[in-house]
Amino acid sequence: LTLLRERKAPTIHDVARVAKLSKSTVSNVIRNAPGVSAETRARVQAAITELGYKTNIVARQLAQQRTRVLGVVIGDLANPFYAEMAKLLESFAAARGFQVMFCNTQVDEEVELAGIRSLLEHRVAGLLFLAYAGSAGGAQAAVGGNLPVVFVTCSADWGDVVAVDDFGGVAAATQHLIGLGHRRIAYFADTVIEENADNDRKAGYIRAMTRAGHRPQLLRWDAKPDTVIADGETRSIRSVLTGPGRMTGIVAANDLHAIDVLDCADRLGLSVPGQLSVVGFDDIAIAGLARIGLTTIAQPKEMMAQIAIETLERRISGALRGGRLRQITDFTFVERTTTGKAQE
């Protein structure tokens, strides 16, 4: 019988022997350290190619007590906005030599905290939050003060922030409806009350309504089908959109909520924008489809993702030190076909 022995993988010692250089010189070439001549680099590369040597990137990074991996905490991947932002973050991270690990929390504090701890166990070099449930303070305690953190499209009282002007965006959306003659305009959000972007957006709506002398009306989905919470009471969506004193304009906290409202209007036989005008927020890809044509506030997703990755990389490298950065980008008002002049 012929016994086949597994070929031993070449080591850095083998590369040094073939290149006729010291192990430390070979290591400098592999690490792309400065001060190494082009001739020496060529000799090492030739030896690596001849032997089929592969560097153990993970082992090398762990030995240096860091990895080139970033953790991204996502609120809900079912929301296209988060999915679009996650893709952009991954792309910009890859361009800078980082890999990305994702944690989908459903904006649940316990799930969020467990996910953060898992990312920390993988020794991520930094964290990016696309949504922040708060984790009852546990997230900040788990992360500590040494790991760079950037909040993207959301905010907290710790870490750097990259976000759009949420307040100004919703104020502009509300003013647009007021300018079209609408008076009964509601702000529509989810049952999950977030302590960051949603509060700023809600405040922008309230400011615009009160300055125009109109009564703000806050709505959010109830747990029961086709019902909402209005003024602390459970009401049917039908009564809000078709009953006495019905709403003629809706400003939604995001595009998904706006599309939900459009669906309700369709089932109730309401014409949009004839009987109801709707504005969203985010400008997700499907908002621009001809069958939807959603008027919305566009976030500069690509710009925010790029700024977030650059900020985190500078924190990791030590090029950026000092206090928290809060970088706020401008929004773009995108008028499509779901808004029109008030008919009553």
Question: Predicted regions span which residues?
Answer:
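ATP/adenylate-binding site constellation spanning eukaryotic-like Ser/Thr protein kinases
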Residues: 41, 67, 86, 182, ...
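Secondary-structure boundary/capping motif
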Residues: 36, 81, 111, 196-197, ...
